[in-house]
Amino acid sequence: MFLGEYEHTVDEKGRLAIPAKFRAGLAEGLVLTRGFDQNLLLYPMPVWRELAARINALPITQPSARNLRRLMFAGASDLGLDKQGRIVLPPNLRQYATITNQAVVTGMDSFIEIWSAERWQTVLDSFADEAPALAEHVSAFGI
């Protein structure tokens, strides 16, 4: 289970330390890909395999299914942690997420999001205004 938010430096080689609490959950490998909100998504390999199977089951005749495949698979990188518990963020993904020297790693239970520090702050700031409407909206789902 991945929970919490952690700010880390991205070094000149694009290396980002993954929080120590998260590393055991990534021992079987991981996949890094583009997210939906100009962020990056980091999946443990077992979770990625399940997600990929569901995406691959979508009909290729639907434009939205093709676009989802492009978003999730075209920029994806199969990675591993180095001895210091870091991953290398590929340049194309750093550019997509506008990550320069600071990144925020957030636990999303079964996967991890990686944000530029600036973009994450914008997301947090929006919560103050949107929280009541969000609470009302998700109540329809029984949450």
From Swiss-Prot:
One of its GO terms (molecular function) is DNA-binding transcription factor activity. Pfam families: MraZ. GO terms for cellular component: cytoplasm; nucleoid. Gene3D superfamilies: Transcriptional regulator MraZ domain. It is found in: Cytoplasm, Nucleoid. NCBIfam families: division/cell wall cluster transcriptional repressor MraZ (TIGR00242). Forms oligomers. This is Transcriptional regulator MraZ. It comes from Herpetosiphon aurantiacus (strain ATCC 23779 / DSM 785 / 114-95).
